[in-house]
Amino acid sequence: MCGQHYTSIISSITTEASFERVRTHEFIKFSKHKRFDQRHRSMMGQYHSGGEIVSPGTSPFDVLPEDCISNIISFTSPRDACVAASVSKTFESAVSSDCVWDKFLPPEYESLVSRSRVFASKKELYFALCHNPVLIEDGKKSFWLEKASGKRCIMLSSKELWITWGSSPEYWQWISIPESRFNKIAELLDVCWFEIRGKTSARVLSPGTRYSAYIVFKTKDRCPGLGHLPVEVGLGLVGQESSKRFIYFIGPRDRRGRRETRDVTKPDQREDGWMEAELGEFFNEERCDEIEFSVIEIKSPSWKSGLIIQGIEFRPTKSQ
């Protein structure tokens, strides 16, 4: 019922407020702007001298029923919903509605959370899935939501990977460490032929989204025979040619300008204490089926050791 009727109300309000080309959802952007005249500032709430909102005031959109505001906000994003909560007390209340956060949750969310845990609201549940990854598929995958967008993220445990000689205890061992989200992860003991491959269904990821894939790891004793070598990695759709690049697990040993080091991706430190190196990017279209990846170093005759692999992570690519 609120659709076209309240769209015209929003249009008349924004015209009166002298905003040009305001679309229905643009009220969520008001609090981001610092260049408002005094009239707009008084409409949008309380500001300090820097021009940013410190507490919600009133908004011309407060004439709308709260459930209609909630319905409109549910068609935006979690980030925009949080911004909208700063517009006014009415918006703050509307944003807290379960109908808003239900739209941001994955359809199967009930199967992802423990039945023994009770959440006060869908908003609380949403942020729980952002901050506390849950194990799925017999504990071999980890699932969570990107906080700003609600896009799906997953990590495949090293148990889900195909590792050459991975079942041979003289070459690899499976360990449990408290800082891992998985029960067992792979530790490289000693190999010449270092090869890891894997694939996963793209359907567990959000469609219409560009993703980046990362290998998540730790090193021991400077990762002898491997840490300073460029390692070839590949990523792509099954049945198509994969994109190739090179990564380091530590970095080049000689920093005096070897040509090949300029095009090799160096690892980054993560907030959770692990390291990660990017394997590549892909766009997850509606028709995407499976994504495959590889991490290989078989050119050097050196014996390789000192690498602990937690898994392969897929998350939305950050905008540059």
Curated annotation (Swiss-Prot):
Disulfide bonds: none annotated. This is F-box protein At2g02240. It comes from the Eukaryota. PROSITE patterns: FBOX. It holds the Pfam family PP2. InterPro entries: F-box-like_dom_sf, F-box_dom, PP2-like. One of its GO terms (biological process) is embryo development ending in seed dormancy.
